[in-house]
Amino acid sequence: MESLNALLQGMGLMHLGAGQAIMLLVSLLLLWLAIAKKFEPLLLLPIGFGGLLSNIPEAGLALTALESLLAHHDAGQLAVIAAKLHCAPDVHAIKEALALALPSVQNQMENLAVDMGYTPGVLALFYKVAIGSGVAPLVIFMGVGAMTDFGPLLANPRTLLLGAAAQFGIFATVLGALTLNYFGLISFTLPQAAAIGIIGGADGPTAIYLSGKLAPELLGAIAVAAYSYMALVPLIQPPIMKALTSETERKIRMVQLRTVSKREKILFPVVLLMLVALLLPDAAPLLGMFCFGNLMRESGVVERLSDTVQNGLINIVTIFLGLSVGAKLVADKFLQPQTLGILLLGVIAFGIGTAAGVLMAKLLNLCSKNKINPLIGSAGVSAVPMAARVSNKVGLESDAQNFLLMHAMGPNVAGVIGSAIAAGVMLKYVLAM
């Protein structure tokens, strides 16, 4: 009988909590969205599967060595950790002390847990290498740069303003998060508000990079919101675009784009990086990798490297990035009131960014002979190339011969640049406070 009891106690099912059960269902929902609905499957599938692995009871795949120690509830070991942190020897007090501790102290406690015989789970290791170091989002940005054509932006530089205007959604969302905190509805710190705001840029790698730096405890919810709403761009944007434009404006035909020379395409990423990085060094990592990837593409002398970055490398890193995000889909971090706030603010951010881009296009038309179709302003959010396709689709509904795709790629690419710069602004000023 004792053997049977020991066998049952060894089963993960016997230790399944309500929170873990809910998160398993959330993970299955993400898998269903990725497979059945094809919502950003390249990221949502590994994120969903990482969520499944993270919530298997007793497996500890997403736990660091220190988290494994705290989950073990050994009184002697808890006393040692508590003495180092000068707090009461219970799990809750230790977690509160760790949250307030400096990163160097947290690393010391992690090393102490390793010395006591605990090891981090495989997903925790993935997270430390891929996101904790910031490497994975940067490599993906390099791949995105290698797949990006700056031609439409260079052919019509005014569209850079549309991409810049769409970033208004980012900063409006930061204010929204702080407003919720001010009125006591949902508690958000300034770093958390900044990390949530970047969802408005519709740029998954940037959202993961910034939240990993500013609010790693919210990374799972922010990443899920960012990629889910990116997949929903065809549903979110058209009503806003139609509400802000007239039938006549939607029928505006833009002049043919000029041919951009190879020299311009080679010089642009170099000049862009130097201008932005010299003024805002904190934007250099993201923008630097993006421009490097684009330079490999446009130079034409490293085709093997460009092909590797666009295909093999970005695919491999995407797998580990998704699983690493899944490591944050654990019940005690995801099932919080903050998650609802993130989901709400995320969709508002998309809406504001879309509206700002459209309104900027209308403003430019007031002082320009060559009119811009306001629909391409919505492509200023950096969901590449989905936002540009939505602009083209809505335009074709009003005029079946009005093809806006290449025109919309200009603000779409500008949006990628804008979101990287916005992330640099957040890092510089939020971390300085």
Swiss-Prot record:
| EC number(s) given by UniProt | 7.2.4.2
* Keyword Membrane assigned: yes
What cofactor(s) does the depicted protein rely on? Answer: Na(+)
How is this protein positioned relative to the membrane?
A: Multi-pass membrane protein
Provide the disulphide bond pattern: none
Pfam families in alphabetical order:
OAD_beta
* UniProt keyword list: Cell membrane, Ion transport, Membrane, Sodium, Sodium transport, Translocase, Transmembrane, Transmembrane helix, Transport
Q: Where in the cell is it found?
A: Cell membrane
The entry's function note states: Catalyzes the decarboxylation of oxaloacetate coupled to Na(+) translocation.
> Which family does the UniProt entry place this protein in?
Belongs to the GcdB/MmdB/OadB family.
Q: How does it assemble?
A: Heterotrimer of an alpha, a beta and a gamma subunit.
Stated name of the protein: Oxaloacetate decarboxylase beta chain 2
